[in-house]
Swiss-Prot record:
Database matches in CDD domains: OAT (cd02152)
Role according to the record: Catalyzes two activities which are involved in the cyclic version of arginine biosynthesis: the synthesis of N-acetylglutamate from glutamate and acetyl-CoA as the acetyl donor, and of ornithine by transacetylation between N(2)-acetylornithine and glutamate.
Pathway: Amino-acid biosynthesis; L-arginine biosynthesis; L-ornithine and N-acetyl-L-glutamate from L-glutamate and N(2)-acetyl-L-ornithine (cyclic): step 1/1; Amino-acid biosynthesis; L-arginine biosynthesis; N(2)-acetyl-L-ornithine from L-glutamate: step 1/4
Residue(s) at site: Cleavage: 182-183
Name the record gives this protein: Arginine biosynthesis bifunctional protein ArgJ
Source organism per UniProt: Corynebacterium efficiens (strain DSM 44549 / YS-314 / AJ 12310 / JCM 11189 / NBRC 100395)
Recorded superkingdom: Bacteria
Top EC class of this enzyme: transferase
One GO-annotated biological process of the protein: ornithine biosynthetic process
Site positions for Involved in the stabilization of negative charge on the oxyanion by the formation of the oxyanion hole: 112-113
Family per similarity comment: Belongs to the ArgJ family.
Quaternary structure note: Heterotetramer of two alpha and two beta chains.
Major localisation: cytoplasm
Length: 388
């Protein structure tokens, strides 16, 4: 039966297990294996300068554009653990390599969870044993997607069917969402026959306009990793544009799922900025609004408080005419020429989706959209209790 995630494309199998890393006792380790005949790989990692040990190892191993497997654990980030953390990440890869008969450099590794605690290597080793046991690997994409969850409330999968080839994906991440990815792990698989250069181009283009425009709370994780693995098992060689479109579609779907499942979310908010000189300025302005706590609180309260939008965007590094800014909530003008529009306070924001559009009045062609959420009581409750 066709799967909806990473095992939908030909040439991929997966497994999942409960190793006891999560205090909840829920599944917490997963394995994705590319059975070939090709082993093309590309990745995008966090831009946080404090990077977790698995990111260091994966960055080295994917540099040649080839990977045959990726190991995941949830419940422990293996970040900020010094040389011991690095050694544990490498030990995990070495142990898996022995079990699968692969070279260690053919394996990627990802961790997510609490920062600053050493990996329980006895549990990791036992988990690898279970992941590679006879009969464990198969069409288990859904189980793998569930095993990588942390504060997610639902697993996240998608599939894109192209002309004779497929892209599948799984992801996790609902908090610490900000540019340069998020607390986010994503694995995309495809049975298309592509080169490493094609994979890198498609992944960079897709993440730039999907995951990197998702900004939930302004925090950037130490562990962000997005992998694209290609088996070539379909025998189809798409063009670069065809690959770009399919990878974008998969990433966009996952990004929307992450926004919908964001920690404590009650409102899904899009912030679009126009009327400035460059796209870079527009995205800076949109992010400045999206990160502003007063704005986010107004969204939680369904309050069409356009003044908070102006106060926030005025801090952005973007060209603007401060006397001629326009703000629209759900396509209704609430502020024109930087003053309130008639009926602004009566705009209905009670729905779950809110579209905010801001014209900075500088007359340029720059534009960008950032997706965010409101700031609710539940968000504070979830994150104040996270380490416990």
């Amino acid at each position: 039966m066709a799967q909806t995630g990473i095992t939908a494309p030909k040439g991929f199998v997966a497994s999942a297990t409960t190793a006891g890393i999560k205090p909840s006792g829920k599944p917490d380790m997963a394995l994705v294996v590319n059975q070939g005949p090709e082993y093309t790989a590309a990745a995008v990692f966090t831009r946080n300068r404090v990077i977790a040990s698995p990111v260091k190892v994966s960055r080295e191993n994917v540099a040649d554009g080839q990977l045959k497997a990726v190991l995941y654990n949830a419940g422990n980030a293996n970040a900020c653990n010094g040389t011991q953390g690095d050694a544990d990440a490498r030990e995990s890869v070495n142990t898996l390599a022995t079990k699968l008969g692969l070279a260690p450099e053919d394996i990627g590794v990802c961790s997510t969870g609490l920062i600053g605690e050493l990996l329980p290597m006895d549990k990791v080793t036992a988990g690898i044993e279970a992941l590679t046991a006879e009969g464990a690997l198969g069409d288990n994409g859904a189980a793998a997607a569930q095993a990588i969850m942390t504060t997610d409330t639902v697993d996240k999968e998608t599939v894109v069917f192209a002309d004779g080839w497929t892209v599948g994906a799984m992801g996790k991440g609902v908090g610490m969402m900000a540019p340069s990815l998020a607390t986010m792990l994503v694995c995309l698989t495809t049975d298309a026959s592509i080169t490493p250069a094609m994979a890198r181009i498609a992944l960079a283009k897709a993440t730039a306009v999907t995951f990197e425009t998702l900004d939930i709370d302004g925090s950037t994780s130490t562990n962000d990793t997005v992998f694209l693995l290609a088996s070539g098992a379909s025998g189809v060689k798409p063009t670069q544009d065809e690959l770009n479109d399919a990878v974008f579609a998969a990433c966009s779907d996952l990004a929307e799922q992450m926004q919908a499942d964001a920690e404590g979310v009650t409102k899904r908010v899009s912030v679009t900025v126009t009327g400035t000189t460059t796209d870079e300025m527009a995205i800076n302005a949109a992010r400045t609004i999206a990160r502003d706590n007063l704005f986010k609180c107004a969204m939680f309260g369904s309050d069409p408080n356009w003044g908070r939008v102006l106060a926030a965007v005025g801090m952005a590094d973007a060209d603007m005419d401060p006397d001629h800014i326009a703000v629209y909530f759900n396509d209704q003008a609430v502020c024109l020429d930087s003053t309130g529009a008639p009926g602004a306070r009566e705009v209905d924001l009670s729905g779950a989706d809110i579209a905010v559009r801001v014209d900075l009045g500088a007359g340029g062609e720059g534009q960008a959209t950032v997706r965010t959420t409101d700031l609710s009581y539940s968000y504070v409750e979830i994150n104040s209790a996270y380490s416990t």
